Amino acid sequence: AGKTTFLKHVALRGVSSDLSRVPIFIGLKQLSDSGLSVFDFIVNEFDVCNFPDATAYLDQLLKAGRAILLFDGLDEVNVADDERRRLTADVENFTRKYNDCQRLITCRLAADDYHFQGYTYVEMADFDQVQIREFVGKWFDGDTKQRERQDLFLSELNMAESEGLREL
């Protein structure tokens, strides 16, 4: 339904419209697999990019409420061994500690048995056929070759065997 794309859009819009807030994208499956706390996972991501003194910078940024925390894919976290419940508690504790930061969490409806206090729940509607054509048109915006790719993509999308792709 475009949850990850939506979060990336929020991150890009946040950066372009408000330079005082730093978007931080956190894949919850990757966080879960790492075994790290939310804070240590984010620090690790900054360290991978050779960000100097990431721990102090992030602590200051988060305490000042200058981050947009984008948690993606709660439904992708393993339910076995109570991992999703542990991760949910960790995310709740983290966001409670840094309560001044804006935050979003995405999850498929199938995993809606986890509710976070202080969050507003919204459901993303699926695109209709007109919206799909408009989106694809903007995606492939360009010269004649791009229009040919757009037409090919739309024709393949409408094929019976592409039902799974259409559901995305």
PLM feature spans:
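P-loop NTPase signaling cores
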Residues: A1-L168
